[in-house]
Protein backbone atom coordinates (compact mmCIF):
# COMPACT_ATOMS: atom_id res chain seq x y z
CA UNK A 1 0.00 0.00 0.00
CA UNK A 2 1.47 3.36 -1.03
CA UNK A 3 1.84 6.00 1.64
CA UNK A 4 2.34 9.76 1.42
CA UNK A 5 5.88 10.45 0.30
CA UNK A 6 6.24 7.25 -1.73
CA UNK A 7 6.85 7.50 -5.44
CA UNK A 8 3.68 7.51 -7.50
CA UNK A 9 3.90 5.37 -10.66
CA UNK A 10 3.19 7.25 -13.88
CA UNK A 11 -0.33 6.96 -15.28
CA UNK A 12 -1.99 7.89 -18.53
CA UNK A 13 -3.22 11.45 -18.93
CA UNK A 14 -1.65 14.81 -18.24
CA UNK A 15 0.50 15.14 -15.13
CA UNK A 16 -0.24 18.48 -13.49
CA UNK A 17 0.55 19.90 -10.07
CA UNK A 18 -2.15 21.27 -7.85
CA UNK A 19 -0.85 23.73 -5.30
CA UNK A 20 -2.43 23.34 -1.90
CA UNK A 21 -1.61 24.53 1.56
CA UNK A 22 1.06 21.85 1.79
CA UNK A 23 3.61 20.63 -0.73
CA UNK A 24 2.46 20.54 -4.34
CA UNK A 25 1.27 17.05 -5.22
CA UNK A 26 1.29 15.51 -8.72
CA UNK A 27 -2.21 14.71 -9.85
CA UNK A 28 -3.24 13.24 -13.19
CA UNK A 29 -6.25 15.00 -14.63
CA UNK A 30 -7.67 14.61 -18.13
CA UNK A 31 -6.41 17.71 -19.90
CA UNK A 32 -6.01 19.42 -16.51
CA UNK A 33 -9.69 20.34 -16.94
CA UNK A 34 -11.62 18.38 -14.32
CA UNK A 35 -10.42 18.30 -10.70
CA UNK A 36 -11.39 15.29 -8.63
CA UNK A 37 -14.72 15.40 -6.83
CA UNK A 38 -14.88 13.33 -3.65
CA UNK A 39 -18.54 12.35 -3.41
CA UNK A 40 -18.35 10.54 -0.07
CA UNK A 41 -16.63 11.93 3.01
CA UNK A 42 -17.66 12.15 6.66
CA UNK A 43 -16.78 15.38 8.47
CA UNK A 44 -17.13 15.51 12.24
CA UNK A 45 -15.26 16.32 15.43
CA UNK A 46 -14.82 14.27 18.58
CA UNK A 47 -16.85 16.88 20.48
CA UNK A 48 -20.09 15.95 18.70
CA UNK A 49 -22.45 13.69 20.69
CA UNK A 50 -22.95 10.28 19.10
CA UNK A 51 -26.36 8.75 18.53
CA UNK A 52 -27.62 6.23 21.05
CA UNK A 53 -27.42 3.46 18.42
CA UNK A 54 -23.95 4.36 17.14
CA UNK A 55 -22.31 1.13 15.96
CA UNK A 56 -18.81 2.28 16.95
CA UNK A 57 -17.04 5.09 18.76
CA UNK A 58 -14.35 6.32 16.35
CA UNK A 59 -10.91 7.20 17.64
CA UNK A 60 -10.39 9.63 14.74
CA UNK A 61 -12.25 12.67 13.52
CA UNK A 62 -12.09 14.91 10.46
CA UNK A 63 -12.81 18.60 11.02
CA UNK A 64 -13.74 20.67 7.99
CA UNK A 65 -10.58 22.80 8.05
CA UNK A 66 -8.32 19.77 8.06
CA UNK A 67 -10.25 18.19 5.22
CA UNK A 68 -10.11 21.30 3.04
CA UNK A 69 -6.33 21.22 3.37
CA UNK A 70 -6.33 17.53 2.46
CA UNK A 71 -8.44 18.29 -0.61
CA UNK A 72 -5.96 20.91 -1.79
CA UNK A 73 -3.02 18.61 -1.22
CA UNK A 74 -4.56 15.89 -3.38
CA UNK A 75 -6.07 17.86 -6.25
CA UNK A 76 -9.66 17.48 -5.08
CA UNK A 77 -11.71 20.48 -6.10
CA UNK A 78 -15.06 19.73 -4.49
CA UNK A 79 -16.54 17.23 -2.06
CA UNK A 80 -19.81 15.86 -0.74
CA UNK A 81 -20.36 15.29 2.97
CA UNK A 82 -22.24 12.04 3.50
CA UNK A 83 -24.51 12.05 6.54
CA UNK A 84 -22.98 9.93 9.26
CA UNK A 85 -25.05 7.25 10.97
CA UNK A 86 -23.04 7.66 14.17
CA UNK A 87 -24.58 11.12 14.60
CA UNK A 88 -28.16 10.19 13.77
CA UNK A 89 -30.14 13.26 12.70
CA UNK A 90 -27.64 15.69 14.25
CA UNK A 91 -26.81 17.49 11.00
CA UNK A 92 -25.52 20.72 12.56
CA UNK A 93 -21.83 20.30 11.73
CA UNK A 94 -22.55 19.38 8.13
CA UNK A 95 -24.89 22.33 7.61
CA UNK A 96 -22.41 24.78 9.17
CA UNK A 97 -19.69 23.48 6.84
CA UNK A 98 -21.94 23.83 3.80
CA UNK A 99 -22.86 27.40 4.72
CA UNK A 100 -19.22 28.39 5.01
CA UNK A 101 -17.71 26.55 2.02
CA UNK A 102 -19.29 26.59 -1.42
CA UNK A 103 -17.00 23.80 -2.61
CA UNK A 104 -18.94 21.41 -0.37
CA UNK A 105 -22.37 19.82 -0.69
CA UNK A 106 -23.97 17.25 1.58
CA UNK A 107 -26.70 14.85 2.58
CA UNK A 108 -28.58 14.68 5.87
CA UNK A 109 -30.38 12.12 7.99
CA UNK A 110 -33.94 13.17 8.88
CA UNK A 111 -37.02 11.71 10.47
CA UNK A 112 -39.74 10.84 7.91
CA UNK A 113 -42.06 13.50 9.34
CA UNK A 114 -39.63 16.37 8.77
CA UNK A 115 -41.33 19.57 7.66
CA UNK A 116 -40.98 20.73 4.04
CA UNK A 117 -39.81 24.18 5.16
CA UNK A 118 -36.91 22.62 7.05
CA UNK A 119 -35.89 20.72 3.91
CA UNK A 120 -36.14 23.88 1.80
CA UNK A 121 -33.87 25.74 4.22
CA UNK A 122 -31.40 22.85 4.12
CA UNK A 123 -31.43 23.00 0.34
CA UNK A 124 -30.49 26.69 0.41
CA UNK A 125 -27.60 25.74 2.71
CA UNK A 126 -26.20 23.22 0.21
CA UNK A 127 -27.92 19.96 1.14
CA UNK A 128 -28.74 17.85 -1.90
CA UNK A 129 -30.32 14.72 -0.48
CA UNK A 130 -31.24 12.54 2.47
CA UNK A 131 -29.38 9.44 3.51
CA UNK A 132 -30.99 6.14 4.40
CA UNK A 133 -28.29 4.52 6.51
CA UNK A 134 -30.00 1.17 6.78
CA UNK A 135 -27.10 -1.14 7.44
CA UNK A 136 -27.21 -3.13 10.67
CA UNK A 137 -30.94 -2.55 11.20
CA UNK A 138 -32.82 -5.46 12.72
CA UNK A 139 -35.92 -4.44 10.74
CA UNK A 140 -36.08 -2.14 7.73
CA UNK A 141 -38.52 0.78 7.70
CA UNK A 142 -41.63 0.40 5.55
CA UNK A 143 -41.35 2.69 2.53
CA UNK A 144 -45.10 2.27 1.94
CA UNK A 145 -45.84 3.83 5.31
CA UNK A 146 -47.62 7.18 4.73
CA UNK A 147 -44.85 9.12 6.48
CA UNK A 148 -42.18 7.68 4.18
CA UNK A 149 -44.38 8.18 1.11
CA UNK A 150 -44.69 11.87 2.02
CA UNK A 151 -40.96 12.10 2.62
CA UNK A 152 -40.13 10.59 -0.77
CA UNK A 153 -42.64 12.93 -2.43
CA UNK A 154 -40.91 15.92 -0.84
CA UNK A 155 -37.46 14.66 -1.77
CA UNK A 156 -38.51 14.26 -5.40
CA UNK A 157 -40.25 17.63 -5.41
CA UNK A 158 -37.06 19.35 -4.22
CA UNK A 159 -35.00 17.65 -6.93
CA UNK A 160 -33.02 15.83 -4.24
CA UNK A 161 -31.93 12.22 -4.07
CA UNK A 162 -31.94 9.39 -1.57
CA UNK A 163 -28.47 8.17 -0.66
CA UNK A 164 -28.80 4.49 0.22
CA UNK A 165 -26.39 2.44 2.31
CA UNK A 166 -27.64 -1.09 2.85
CA UNK A 167 -26.40 -4.67 2.76
CA UNK A 168 -26.35 -6.11 -0.74
CA UNK A 169 -28.70 -8.98 0.08
CA UNK A 170 -31.33 -6.49 1.30
CA UNK A 171 -30.87 -4.07 -1.59
CA UNK A 172 -33.27 -5.37 -4.31
CA UNK A 173 -36.72 -4.64 -2.80
CA UNK A 174 -35.63 -1.33 -1.28
CA UNK A 175 -34.02 -0.08 -4.48
CA UNK A 176 -36.99 -1.20 -6.55
CA UNK A 177 -39.41 0.67 -4.27
CA UNK A 178 -37.31 3.84 -4.36
CA UNK A 179 -37.07 3.79 -8.15
CA UNK A 180 -40.83 3.30 -8.44
CA UNK A 181 -41.38 6.30 -6.15
CA UNK A 182 -39.75 8.57 -8.73
CA UNK A 183 -36.84 9.78 -6.59
CA UNK A 184 -33.24 9.78 -7.71
CA UNK A 185 -31.12 7.25 -5.83
CA UNK A 186 -27.38 7.15 -5.11
CA UNK A 187 -26.23 3.75 -3.88
CA UNK A 188 -23.18 3.78 -1.62
CA UNK A 189 -20.10 1.57 -1.71
CA UNK A 190 -20.38 -0.19 -5.09
CA UNK A 191 -23.81 -1.48 -4.02
CA UNK A 192 -22.11 -3.92 -1.63
CA UNK A 193 -21.57 -6.65 -4.28
CA UNK A 194 -21.31 -10.30 -3.36
CA UNK A 195 -17.63 -11.09 -2.75
CA UNK A 196 -17.81 -14.30 -4.80
CA UNK A 197 -20.46 -13.63 -7.44
CA UNK A 198 -19.86 -9.92 -7.88
CA UNK A 199 -22.85 -8.53 -9.77
CA UNK A 200 -23.91 -11.92 -11.13
CA UNK A 201 -26.06 -12.70 -8.09
CA UNK A 202 -29.57 -11.53 -7.25
CA UNK A 203 -28.58 -8.26 -5.58
CA UNK A 204 -26.08 -7.38 -8.29
CA UNK A 205 -28.62 -8.07 -11.03
CA UNK A 206 -31.12 -5.82 -9.26
CA UNK A 207 -28.59 -3.00 -9.10
CA UNK A 208 -27.64 -3.30 -12.78
CA UNK A 209 -31.32 -3.40 -13.72
CA UNK A 210 -32.02 -0.27 -11.66
CA UNK A 211 -29.15 1.55 -13.35
CA UNK A 212 -31.09 1.14 -16.57
CA UNK A 213 -33.85 3.37 -15.17
CA UNK A 214 -31.66 6.46 -15.50
CA UNK A 215 -32.52 7.50 -11.93
CA UNK A 216 -29.82 5.53 -10.12
CA UNK A 217 -26.14 6.34 -9.51
CA UNK A 218 -23.49 4.27 -7.71
CA UNK A 219 -20.51 5.41 -5.67
CA UNK A 220 -17.13 3.77 -6.17
CA UNK A 221 -16.38 4.17 -2.49
CA UNK A 222 -15.10 2.26 0.55
CA UNK A 223 -13.61 -0.59 -1.46
CA UNK A 224 -11.09 -1.05 1.35
CA UNK A 225 -13.91 -2.51 3.46
CA UNK A 226 -14.49 -5.49 1.20
CA UNK A 227 -11.30 -7.41 1.86
CA UNK A 228 -10.71 -7.94 -1.87
CA UNK A 229 -7.81 -6.98 -4.11
CA UNK A 230 -7.47 -4.15 -6.60
CA UNK A 231 -8.19 -6.49 -9.51
CA UNK A 232 -11.56 -7.41 -8.03
CA UNK A 233 -12.45 -3.77 -7.38
CA UNK A 234 -11.44 -2.96 -10.95
CA UNK A 235 -13.82 -5.68 -12.20
CA UNK A 236 -16.61 -4.20 -10.09
CA UNK A 237 -15.93 -0.77 -11.59
CA UNK A 238 -15.76 -2.15 -15.13
CA UNK A 239 -19.11 -3.90 -14.72
CA UNK A 240 -20.75 -0.71 -13.47
CA UNK A 241 -19.18 1.34 -16.25
CA UNK A 242 -20.48 -1.12 -18.84
CA UNK A 243 -23.97 -1.00 -17.32
CA UNK A 244 -24.36 2.73 -16.83
CA UNK A 245 -21.39 4.65 -18.19
CA UNK A 246 -19.30 7.13 -16.18
CA UNK A 247 -22.16 9.63 -16.02
CA UNK A 248 -23.89 7.46 -13.42
CA UNK A 249 -20.87 6.74 -11.24
CA UNK A 250 -19.24 8.87 -8.56
CA UNK A 251 -15.97 8.37 -6.71
CA UNK A 252 -15.80 8.72 -2.94
CA UNK A 253 -12.92 8.33 -0.50
CA UNK A 254 -15.00 7.44 2.61
CA UNK A 255 -12.53 9.47 4.69
CA UNK A 256 -11.69 9.32 7.56
CA UNK A 257 -12.07 5.54 7.04
CA UNK A 258 -13.92 4.71 10.25
CA UNK A 259 -13.88 0.98 10.87
CA UNK A 260 -10.95 0.24 8.55
CA UNK A 261 -9.18 -2.97 9.54
CA UNK A 262 -5.81 -1.58 8.46
CA UNK A 263 -4.62 2.03 8.24
CA UNK A 264 -5.90 3.85 5.15
CA UNK A 265 -4.77 7.30 4.05
CA UNK A 266 -6.44 9.79 1.77
CA UNK A 267 -3.69 9.28 -0.76
CA UNK A 268 -4.43 5.55 -0.68
CA UNK A 269 -8.03 6.33 -1.63
CA UNK A 270 -7.06 8.67 -4.48
CA UNK A 271 -4.57 6.16 -5.86
CA UNK A 272 -7.08 3.32 -5.57
CA UNK A 273 -9.47 5.27 -7.80
CA UNK A 274 -6.71 5.61 -10.41
CA UNK A 275 -6.00 1.89 -10.25
CA UNK A 276 -9.56 0.62 -10.51
CA UNK A 277 -10.42 3.13 -13.26
CA UNK A 278 -7.05 3.41 -15.06
CA UNK A 279 -8.42 5.51 -17.94
CA UNK A 280 -7.85 9.16 -16.97
CA UNK A 281 -10.56 10.36 -19.34
CA UNK A 282 -13.12 8.10 -17.66
CA UNK A 283 -12.05 9.34 -14.23
CA UNK A 284 -12.56 12.87 -15.47
CA UNK A 285 -16.06 12.07 -16.68
CA UNK A 286 -16.88 10.48 -13.32
CA UNK A 287 -15.78 13.65 -11.54
CA UNK A 288 -17.74 15.76 -14.00
CA UNK A 289 -20.81 13.64 -13.29
CA UNK A 290 -20.51 14.47 -9.59
CA UNK A 291 -19.98 18.15 -10.42
CA UNK A 292 -23.17 18.17 -12.45
CA UNK A 293 -25.23 16.15 -9.99
CA UNK A 294 -24.30 17.98 -6.80
CA UNK A 295 -23.19 21.47 -7.84
CA UNK A 296 -25.11 22.55 -10.96
Model-identified regions with their sequence ranges:
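Hydrophobic faces of well-ordered beta-strands that scaffold small-molecule active sites
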Residues: 37-41, 79-82, 105-108, 128-132, ...
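Active-site environment of divalent metal-dependent phosphoester hydrolases
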Residues: 44-46, 86-89, 113-114, 137-138, ...
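Catalytic pocket-lining loop regions of alpha/beta-barrel enzymes
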Residues: 144-251
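Conserved, mostly hydrophobic/aromatic
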Residues: 40, 71, 94, 130, ...
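Active-site gating/metal-coordination segments in enzymes
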Residues: 88-170, 217-219, 223-225
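Short, acidic/polar
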Residues: 61-69, 113-122, 202-203
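Alpha-helical scaffold segments that flank or form the walls of functional sites
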Residues: 54-82, 87-100
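Mid-to-C-terminal alpha-helical segments outside catalytic/metal-binding sites
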Residues: 2-4, 9-35, 60-78, 239, ...
Amino acid sequence: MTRPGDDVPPRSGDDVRVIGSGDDVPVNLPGAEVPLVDAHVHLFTSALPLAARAWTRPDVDLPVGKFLTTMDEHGVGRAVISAMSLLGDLNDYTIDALREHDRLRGTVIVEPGVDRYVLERMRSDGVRGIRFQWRRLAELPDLDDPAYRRLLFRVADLGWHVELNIEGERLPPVLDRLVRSGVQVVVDHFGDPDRRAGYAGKSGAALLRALGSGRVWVKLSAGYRFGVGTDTLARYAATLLAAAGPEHLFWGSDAPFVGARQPVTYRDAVESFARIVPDAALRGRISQAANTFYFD
